[in-house]
Amino acid sequence: MTKNWTSIFGEFKLEEEELIFKGGTVEFKDSEPGASIANLVCDEYYGGGKISAEITFKDITFPSACEIMIYFDPTTKNFVSVGLGGSGAMYSARSFTNKWIEHSMTGEHKNLEVNKDYNVEVEMKGSQITLKVDNIVVLSTNLPYNLPISQVGLWCQSYSDIHVKNFTVKREKPKAFVVMQFSSPYNELYEDVIKKVCDEQDLNV
């Protein structure tokens, strides 16, 4: 379980083995009261690979949702999130840029279950996003852009608490491609310079 978290907005409690989003009711400006929202960011960086978590809703009423943020921009607060319950669907992939943009939605929100431990895994390869829930591929879509490396986290909305365990990031290292002859002095250049620089920058080469 990733240990270091902060709240951009919303309330959460971090315990030894789990993170708890504190649901409730919140007053929104110029609108009716609604379900509490939280944007939680951790210290893990991601630009491809897999992010997994175990998500449990303690109660479910629309618009209960918990999504893994696979991209977060700290300047604009824009993000891309994939998971459970977004925009009234059971499974969701969407982005927020001052408004919601839905990339792929499937399933009915009413089928989400209370106190069920959902094992959620999001995989990103280039612009392709795949969502697995309990080892079943439930959603796959291509974003209209490639996401840069960023810190990741959770987006939650609910009138009740949501528990998240085993939040794990398995980042795929970016790849550097080198075109050169396999002969001296290029072999020495590769070993002494190129490979060392790529190792320092955490790149596969």
Predicted regions and their residues:
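Peripheral membrane interaction modules
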Residues: 1, 139-143, 164-167
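Extracellular glycan-recognition surfaces and repeat-rich motifs
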Residues: 1-24
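Secretory/extracellular carbohydrate-interaction modules
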Residues: 22-98, 170-174
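Surface-exposed coil/turn segments at beta-strand junctions on protein surfaces, enriched
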Residues: 44-46, 111-115, 124, 147
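Carbohydrate-binding surfaces in secreted/extracellular proteins
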Residues: 53, 114-141
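Short, aromatic/His-centered strand-loop micro-motif at the edge of beta-sheets
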Residues: 96-119
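Flexible glycan-contacting loops in extracellular carbohydrate-active proteins
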Residues: 141-162
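Conserved N-terminal substructure of TIR/SEFIR domains
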Residues: 158-205
